[in-house]
Amino acid sequence: MLNILKNWKNQQTAASNLERYTKEDILKGEIPEHIAIIMDGNGRWAKKRSLPRIAGHHEGMKVVKRTTKLANELGVKVLTLYAFSTENWKRPKMEVDFLMKLPEEFLNTYLPELVEENVQVRIIGDETALPAHTLRAIEKAVQDTAQNDGMILNFALNYGGRTEIVSAAKSLAEKVKEGSLNIEDIDESLFSTYLMTESLQDPELLIRTSGEIRLSNFMLWQVAYSEFVFTDVLWPDFKEDHFLQALGEFQQRGRRFGGI
């Protein structure tokens, strides 16, 4: 199966290299309302340049701003970025400490622009394990942009798809146990309201950078019918052309949701 996926990815990459899309081209087609991105490759980007891994993470922060601005200009309604997974705590302490400072640096630097651009900041994930300084920066950004009604910039921070599903199942089980919910009333629609993304539509497009072909425990429920675009480009090298390319590939797909 893995070989089949790799062959398919190589075919997609070869085909993609034949076309280049402009912003005007993309605006003529369907724009995904919700785009999710697994921002991968910061460490490898730094290693290729004989730099510490944290240099790659810092460079990747600049790409977050550029991508957010472009997505907003194109009319995307929700941009969800996988910033830190529940498994990332296993990394070296120095790297984790730096990653926990990045949201603070990003928001302190770019929050005025996000407010001006009518972007609303949100977060999904287990906030209880986050350092106080990280949480303060996020809470301020969420509060300062709460009245904005433009694109939602949704950071998945200390997030894990399996944990999210288990938590939702436990909440539903508690309601059944206490008698406030009949088990027969539980369906996909109700289950979705117990997820961290309860108020958001599912992503139509998932992009992963760095050439890896896996979900890494990201939005396992929500991406059931998402279109996937895998690119070999490392996240710090991800530019406007690459984002437009992913959207162009999305617009060439036929989304049938199990039909013909």
UniProtKB/Swiss-Prot annotation:
<dbReference type="GO" id="GO:0000287">
    <property type="term" value="F:magnesium ion binding"/>
</dbReference>
<feature type="binding site">
    <location>
        <begin position="41"/>
        <end position="44"/>
    </location>
    <ligand>
        <name>substrate</name>
    </ligand>
</feature>
<dbReference type="GO" id="GO:0016094">
    <property type="term" value="P:polyprenol biosynthetic process"/>
</dbReference>
<dbReference type="GO" id="GO:0008834">
    <property type="term" value="F:ditrans,polycis-undecaprenyl-diphosphate synthase [(2E,6E)-farnesyl-diphosphate specific] activity"/>
</dbReference>
<feature type="binding site">
    <location>
        <position position="53"/>
    </location>
    <ligand>
        <name>substrate</name>
    </ligand>
</feature>
<feature type="binding site">
    <location>
        <position position="57"/>
    </location>
    <ligand>
        <name>substrate</name>
    </ligand>
</feature>
<feature type="active site" description="Proton acceptor">
    <location>
        <position position="88"/>
    </location>
</feature>
<feature type="binding site">
    <location>
        <position position="91"/>
    </location>
    <ligand>
        <name>substrate</name>
    </ligand>
</feature>
<comment type="subunit">
    <text>Homodimer.</text>
</comment>
<dbReference type="GO" id="GO:0030145">
    <property type="term" value="F:manganese ion binding"/>
</dbReference>
<keyword id="KW-0460">Magnesium</keyword>
<dbReference type="GO" id="GO:0005829">
    <property type="term" value="C:cytosol"/>
</dbReference>
<feature type="binding site">
    <location>
        <position position="40"/>
    </location>
    <ligand>
        <name>Mg(2+)</name>
    </ligand>
</feature>
<comment type="similarity">
    <text>Belongs to the UPP synthase family.</text>
</comment>
<feature type="binding site">
    <location>
        <position position="208"/>
    </location>
    <ligand>
        <name>substrate</name>
    </ligand>
</feature>
<keyword id="KW-0808">Transferase</keyword>
<feature type="binding site">
    <location>
        <position position="89"/>
    </location>
    <ligand>
        <name>substrate</name>
    </ligand>
</feature>
<dbReference type="InterPro" id="IPR001441">
    <property type="entry name" value="UPP_synth-like"/>
</dbReference>
<feature type="binding site">
    <location>
        <begin position="214"/>
        <end position="216"/>
    </location>
    <ligand>
        <name>substrate</name>
    </ligand>
</feature>
<dbReference type="InterPro" id="IPR018520">
    <property type="entry name" value="UPP_synth-like_CS"/>
</dbReference>
<feature type="binding site">
    <location>
        <position position="45"/>
    </location>
    <ligand>
        <name>substrate</name>
    </ligand>
</feature>
<dbReference type="InterPro" id="IPR036424">
    <property type="entry name" value="UPP_synth-like_sf"/>
</dbReference>
<dbReference type="Pfam" id="PF01255">
    <property type="entry name" value="Prenyltransf"/>
</dbReference>
<feature type="binding site">
    <location>
        <position position="227"/>
    </location>
    <ligand>
        <name>Mg(2+)</name>
    </ligand>
</feature>
<feature type="binding site">
    <location>
        <begin position="85"/>
        <end position="87"/>
    </location>
    <ligand>
        <name>substrate</name>
    </ligand>
</feature>
<comment type="function">
    <text>Catalyzes the condensation of isopentenyl diphosphate (IPP) with allylic pyrophosphates generating different type of terpenoids.</text>
</comment>
<feature type="active site">
    <location>
        <position position="40"/>
    </location>
</feature>
<keyword id="KW-0479">Metal-binding</keyword>
<protein>
    <recommendedName>
        <fullName>Isoprenyl transferase</fullName>
        <ecNumber>2.5.1.-</ecNumber>
    </recommendedName>
</protein>
